[in-house]
C-alpha cells in the first residue's frame, strides 16, 4: 500500500482484505508499515542538522516495532518511563541508550537493581536516570555507593510546564554539587519538557512569550551547569527538549541537541495539528462487524 494513498474506501477495503488473509478476526491495532516508513523518513528530513532522535518507547510498545524504527531512523536512543520498562529494555535491547522520561523513586530503582542479572547490571551504563530534585540526587548517590556502581543522571529543568524539575538557581546548584562530590554519580544531560508550547491559546502573544521564556530558562540552566561542571562536560552531554508536538519549533542545535518522539510516527488523531501536517496516519483500530 502506498504511504501517500488517501484514506479512501478502497484503502480500508485493502486493509480488510489483508486482515482476512492474515486470519485476524478479533479487534487489533494495525500499523501500516509503508506509511510508518514514510513518517520515519519525514521526521529525519525535518530534523535540524546534528539533532539526535530518541524513540519514545511507550508510544511504540513493541520490541519488533522499536527495532524497526531504530534501524530505519539510524538511532540507538530510547526513552523509557518506569523501572519495569527499563528492566524489559535492558533484557531485550541492552545496547540501546535509555533516557527516563519521568523520575523513578529510589525504592523502585533499588527493587530493579535487586532483580537484575550481572550482565544486565553492566548494561545500566546505558541508562540515564531523570532527576528532579537535589534530594533525589542524594538518594541515588547513596544507593549507588551501596551497590558499588555508577549512575548517569539527566537533570529535569522546569521550563514552564511546572510538572516538576528544577529552575536555575539554588535547587539546580545543590544537585550539581551533589553530583560533583559523589564519584558514583555522573552528569549525562539536561531535559526541558515543553509540550505546553503548542497548547497555549493564541491570545495576547502567549505562545511567543512562552517559547521565549522556555529558551531563557533552559539557557540559564545550561550556563549554570557549565560554570559548575565545565564547558567540556556540557558540550558532550544530552540536551533533550523537543517532542512530537514541538520539534519543528527548533531550527538548529544551539539550545537542544536531541528530540524525542514516537506518536508522530503513527499519527493518531490527537496529533492532527498544523506542525505535524507532513505526517500521515499509520495506526488504525480494526474490529469485525458482527
Predicted regions and their residues:
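Aromatic/hydrophobic pocket-lining residues that form the small-molecule binding cavity
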Residues: 36, 40, 109, 133, ...
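N-terminal glycine-rich anion-binding loops that anchor highly charged ligand groups
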Residues: 12-16, 35-64
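Generic N-terminal amphipathic, Lys/Arg-enriched alpha-helix
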Residues: 11-29
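N-terminal basic/disordered segments at the start of proteins
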Residues: 1-12
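Short coil-to-beta-strand transition motifs
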Residues: 249, 279-286
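Active-site loop/helix belt of alpha/beta enzymes
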Residues: 152, 158-277
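Active-site-proximal beta-alpha core segment in soluble small-molecule metabolic enzymes
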Residues: 53-199
Amino acid at each position: 500500500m502506498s504511504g501517500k494513498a488517501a484514506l479512501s474506501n478502497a484503502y480500508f477495503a485493502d486493509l480488510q482484505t489483508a486482515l482476512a488473509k492474515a486470519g485476524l478476526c478479533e479487534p487489533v491495532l494495525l500499523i501500516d508499515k509503508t506509511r510508518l516508513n514514510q513518517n520515519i523518513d519525514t521526521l529525519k528530513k525535518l530534523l535540524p542538522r546534528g539533532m539526535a532522535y530518541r524513540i519514545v518507547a511507550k508510544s511504540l510498545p513493541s520490541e519488533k516495532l522499536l527495532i524497526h524504527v531504530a534501524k530505519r531512523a539510524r538511532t540507538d536512543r530510547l526513552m523509557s518511563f518506569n523501572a519495569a520498562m527499563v528492566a524489559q529494555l535492558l533484557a531485550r535491547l541492552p545496547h540501546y541508550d535509555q533516557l527516563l522520561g519521568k523520575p523513578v523513586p529510589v525504592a523502585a530503582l533499588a527493587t530493579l537493581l535487586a532483580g537484575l542479572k550481572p550482565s544486565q547490571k553492566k548494561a545500566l551504563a546505558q541508562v540515564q536516570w531523570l532527576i528532579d530534585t537535589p534530594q533525589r540526587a542524594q538518594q541515588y548517590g547513596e544507593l549507588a555507593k551501596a551497590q558499588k556502581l555508577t549512575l548517569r543522571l539527566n537533570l529535569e529543568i522546569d521550563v514552564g510546564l511546572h510538572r516538576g524539575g528544577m529552575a536555575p538557581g539554588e535547587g539546580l546548584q545543590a544537585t550539581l554539587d551533589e553530583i560533583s562530590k559523589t564519584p558514583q554519580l555522573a552528569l549525562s544531560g539536561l531535559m526541558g519538557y515543553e509540550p505546553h508550547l503548542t497548547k497555549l491559546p493564541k491570545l495576547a502573544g502567549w505562545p511567543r512569550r512562552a517559547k521565549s521564556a522556555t529558551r531563557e530558562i533552559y539557557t540559564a540552566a545550561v550556563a549554570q551547569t557549565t560554570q559548575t561542571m565545565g564547558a567540556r562536560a556540557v558540550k558532550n552531554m544530552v540536551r533533550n527538549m523537543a517532542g512530537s508536538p514541538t520539534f519543528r519549533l527548533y531550527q538548529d542545535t544551539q539550545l537542544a541537541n536531541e528530540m524525542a518522539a514516537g506518536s508522530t510516527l503513527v499519527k493518531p488523531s490527537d496529533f492532527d495539528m498544523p506542525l505535524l501536517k507532513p505526517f500521515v496516519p499509520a495506526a488504525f483500530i480494526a474490529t469485525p462487524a458482527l
